[in-house]
Structures are given as structure tokens and as C-alpha cells.
Design a protein with these regions (language model features):
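N-terminal, polar/charged subdomain of small-to-medium soluble alpha/beta proteins
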Residues: 1-95, 106, 110-114, 118-150
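Short hydrophobic/aromatic beta-strand micro-patches
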Residues: 100-102
Length: 150
């Protein structure tokens, strides 16, 4: 069971309650919630906010691929996974991503949650622009839309 979505920050905030409603089931004995939030310091620069941009269709496709790969690589068939990522400007402390997983056992839930966030960071086409207290801003290194074959 999978739910994926890119959420425009102008329209809605990410919600732990939405994630909990989606993954809750008597079939599962373990739930893990991961949230990423905008922090105030990165690379010794004082951050005031971040704009997230993405290629929405390819991001959703990458989330779906990661979910399917988890079946093969982790051998966790019975699971519920909720992934939402924000798009647009976020202030300090606001959530940029929610990953919620439910599995039969806690060890499965921990492994699955970690696998999902690490794979998203490696390959989903999501980019962020940080804004700093000195009125400067920088686009940070992100993932390309097409990965080069070596």
C-alpha cells in the first residue's frame, strides 16, 4: 500500500495526521514516522528559509520505484508507506518531507524507513534554494533528471 504526493506549500502544509491515518492498520505492529524540517544553519550559514523545486512527475515515479525495489531488496511485502514532499517556500521549522511506514515488525519498519529516505536523497529530482540572514541565497547540489551511465 503506497501513497505519494508533492504538496504545494502555498496550498497546504504536510500533516503527520494524514500519514498516520493512511498507515494505521491492525495488520501492522510497528510504525515509524520520519520528518525532515528546515533547520537554521547549513554549512556555517544562517538559514531563514528554503524553496523546494521538483520535477513532480519524475519525483512520484522515483518514489514508486523505491517502494517496488524495497519488495525485492528488503523482502518486506506487507507494508504501508506514505511519502509526501513539500514544494515551494518553507520557513524555519516547517516540514519538507514526511515518510511514514508500517510493517508487521519493528526491525522491518526501521530498515524500510531508512532505505526510503536514503534512496530519495540519492536520486529523486528535488532541488532546494536556501535563503540566508545576509539576504543572499544559493541553490544547493541536487539530483539530475537523467543519471549518467558510466
Amino acid at each position: 500500500m503506497l501513497h505519494t504526493k508533492i504538496v504545494d506549500s502555498k496550498d497546504k502544509k504536510l500533516s503527520i495526521n494524514d500519514a498516520e491515518r493512511f498507515i494505521t492498520s491492525v495488520e501492522f505492529g510497528a510504525s515509524i514516522f520520519f520528518t525532515g524540517t528546515v533547520r537554521n544553519l547549513n554549512n556555517n550559514k544562517s538559514v531563514v528559509g528554503i524553496t523546494y523545486d521538483s520535477h513532480d512527475e519524475l519525483v512520484i515515479k522515483s518514489f514508486e520505484e523505491i517502494y517496488k525495489e524495497a519488495d525485492k531488496k528488503l523482502n518486506i511485502q506487507d507494508k504501508a508507506v506514505f511519502i509526501e514532499h513539500a514544494k515551494g517556500y518553507l520557513n524555519l521549522g516547517e516540514m519538507s518531507i514526511i515518510i511514514a511506514v508500517a510493517c508487521k515488525h519493528r526491525d522491518q519498519a526501521y530498515v524500510l524507513s531508512r532505505y526510503i529516505i536514503e534512496e530519495i536523497k540519492k536520486r529523486s529530482p528535488i532541488w532546494k534554494k536556501e535563503y540566508y540572514t545576509d539576504n543572499q541565497s544559493d541553490w544547493l547540489k541536487g539530483n539530475p533528471i537523467v543519471h549518467e551511465k558510466i
